[in-house]
Amino acid sequence: MSWSVLEALRKDPEILRENLRRRFLPLDMLERAIELDRKWREAVTELNSLRERRNEINRSIPRADPGEREELIRKAKEIGEEIERLEDVLEKLSQERDSILMSMPALIDDSVPIGPNEDYNKPIRFWGKPKVPRSKLDSFMEQTRGFNVEYELIDWEPLGHADELEVMLKQVDTVKAGQLAGSRFFYLFKDIVWLEQALILFALDKISRKGFIPVIPPYMMRRDYYLGVVDLNTFEDSIYKVEGEDLYLIATSEHPLVAMHAGDTFTEDELPRLYVGLSPCFRKEAGTHGKDTKGIFRVHQFTKVEQIVFSKPEESKYWHERLIENAEEIYRELEIPYRIVNIASGDLGASAAKKYDLEGWFPAQGKYRELVSCSNCVDWQSYRLRIKLDRKGRREFVHTLNSTALATTRTISAIVENHQREDGSVRIPKALRKYLEIFEQAPKEEIVPIEKILKE
């Protein structure tokens, strides 16, 4: 049983060098790991030789003459002391080597576009007929260059989601929430509460019908499990730690759902294992100062429905495509125009071998914005968490995949921009209406500004 990164380190370290180059990361730590592994293997060879020599001596002691026996016992003791020393050396070498290897990113897929940052992300397909305000036409044409995307040109300016929700509809309040908890928090009221619940039910219903098991996970995790699902050296600033406790609030249900199978071994007929998680998500949004400060698009707390797959290694590419297709179905039914983007090598997180983003069209901003992130993490997480596949005695690491199905606050933001009318009312997508009809107080077909209600 071998981890892809460790196997490459020993068989062809140039694979790892090239992987780091393609990710625009430094090579120095890798060279250190190669040297440590060389010393470790030399020490293992020496240790095995010493153990074999000690065993030979121990076997000869009972047959030796009394005078010779004492010398053999002395030699066996000396070898034993050397074995103990080498075992300590091996432990230190393996700890330092493995610490470096644990920081190594997943081997990226050959289909990933190469580039240092998000500017090199590659759109691969578009869906829908976006409403494009005349003032945003140039921006839209730039973002759809190379694709023949049909659009509807409009001569009025939709309100941005923040103003629509807080000023026009008056059903979100980030000011009061800010006084209570600080920036990037919010209150939802009335119809927007019902809309959020309908979105959750819609996504859970749709994904579970595809064979995914619904799960509500713990909302906190211990550090040693978090180390298994993310590169905590870079991610720790993004999550909340409980003061005085070895616990972190989860940033997504992906993390506890993947960690749920830590130490488990699957048989071939037990895979794929499919889950759809529902949880609040807590994020510091470190490094986003000044970005999306208004509204509920980028917040510290939100609810998300997440898809998780544990698969055989040879099937993970198939499941990666299925996961993004599931997300596309959701946003097609919500009638949100979108594009699918293949994320560039330099913009990938350490755990992902390949990632797609689904970016929804926001008419008021004139931009496609991220709504879904869909990653194939290959054996990066399973190695750390020791999640294995047993093929009739031959063991290997499973592959793990994750994808947003629906994040409520961003989806609400997309709905109020794309389904907004000139009078400020918002049409509710037909796909959500059956989840609202059962509640007497819930809106059914539209969300109406308070001023319009008072006039009527």
Swiss-Prot record:
CDD domains from the UniProt entry: SerRS_core
Residues given in the record as ATP binding sites: 283-285, 299, 370-373
Keywords per UniProt: Aminoacyl-tRNA synthetase, ATP-binding, Cytoplasm, Ligase, Nucleotide-binding, Protein biosynthesis
Substrates-to-products reaction catalysed: tRNA(Ser) + L-serine + ATP = L-seryl-tRNA(Ser) + AMP + diphosphate + H(+); tRNA(Sec) + L-serine + ATP = L-seryl-tRNA(Sec) + AMP + diphosphate + H(+)
One annotated Gene Ontology cellular component of this protein: cytosol
Protein's GO biological process: selenocysteine biosynthetic process; seryl-tRNA aminoacylation
Enzyme Commission number, as recorded: 6.1.1.11
Free-text function comment from the UniProt entry: Catalyzes the attachment of serine to tRNA(Ser). Is also able to aminoacylate tRNA(Sec) with serine, to form the misacylated tRNA L-seryl-tRNA(Sec), which will be further converted into selenocysteinyl-tRNA(Sec).
Annotated family: Belongs to the class-II aminoacyl-tRNA synthetase family. Type-1 seryl-tRNA synthetase subfamily.
Domain notes: Consists of two distinct domains, a catalytic core and a N-terminal extension that is involved in tRNA binding.
Protein name as it appears in the record: Serine--tRNA ligase
Gene source species: Korarchaeum cryptofilum (strain OPF8)
Upper classification of the organism: Archaea, Thermoproteota, Candidatus Korarchaeia, Candidatus Korarchaeales, Candidatus Korarchaeaceae
Gene designation: serS
